[in-house]
Amino acid sequence: MAKKNEGKRFEEDFRNSVPADVFCYRIKDSSNFYQATKNMCDFILFKSPYLFLLELKSTKANQFSTNEKIIKQHQVDDLYDANMKYTFVKSGFILNYRGRELKTKTVPPETYFIPIEYMREAYYKEKSIHKDLAKKIGIEIPYRKKITRYEYDINLRNFLKK
């Protein structure tokens, strides 16, 4: 059996961390590499009265390129439009900067919810979303490491703070 890529593992850990009283739906990706789907986001969460539209990204680097290959413009724009059009829709990106071992130190993982208003502004102004920028414009999502996987503290009220 093929080893799951780290991004899929992150999505799985995220889904398993969503509280039981929150509706959670993962939008399926296309398995056809020739015709990529144009999904607005990866996850739809509902906790009355809010609907959350979330796109998840994971990297081992210190930044996410705003290159179309990494962060899709249609996702940024569609999430922004939904967020602005509907009062009880909250959209954003969840950026996971995976931990890694360097020669001199261990860099712990960091995960942030970036509200779409801030993400859109950064997407059009910056060449990348560096971890320091995510820390400044986002809301940190606490985690704890189990043996090999992660559990995230998904408190949706925190997503409404910025």
Where are these regions (language model features)?
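Histidine- and/or cysteine-centered catalytic micro-motif in compact active-site loops
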Residues: 29-30, 56-59, 96
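Short connector loops at helix/strand junctions that flank enzyme active sites
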Residues: 38-40, 49-53, 74, 88
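Conserved catalytic cores of phosphodiester-cleaving nucleases, focusing on short active-site segments
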Residues: 43-45, 50-61
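Mg2+/Mn2+-dependent nuclease catalytic core
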Residues: 59-85
